[in-house]
Amino acid sequence: MQKCQYILEPDLPPLAVESQIKHAQRACELDKARLGQSAKSYTAHRWRVHESQLRGAILSHIAAARRIFLKFAQDGSRRTIPDHLQANVSLFEDLDIYVEMVLMQNEIIIINAHDHTPGMPRLPQ
């Protein structure tokens, strides 16, 4: 099995602030998290888990005080996208996945999730 490469600390995006993390936590706890297209596809067909398991994995990530980062724009500017968070979340004991959360009004979030891109460095937990 190939060893994972992680993004180097100086290249990481800023960490999410407590209010953003609480927003994501409340949305998962209150079942106000909605799955984006990639998360729907991966939970149903690839990982074969119920969406509540994905929410539970996010809650476990938060409870363990693992890191959640802001998301950089794709243009290489290192500008962060407002209300977009990302994390390397453990879905199962031996499966870490990429999760993006978009914070919406009324404690709602949109979750996008997929396997890590092969050959690309991952966010650390």
Language model features: what each stretch is:
Residues 96-125:
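Enriched for short, Lys/Arg-rich terminal
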Residues 76-104:
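Basic/aromatic recognition patch in beta-strand/loop cores that engages polyanionic ligands
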Residues 1-82:
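Compact soluble domain cores
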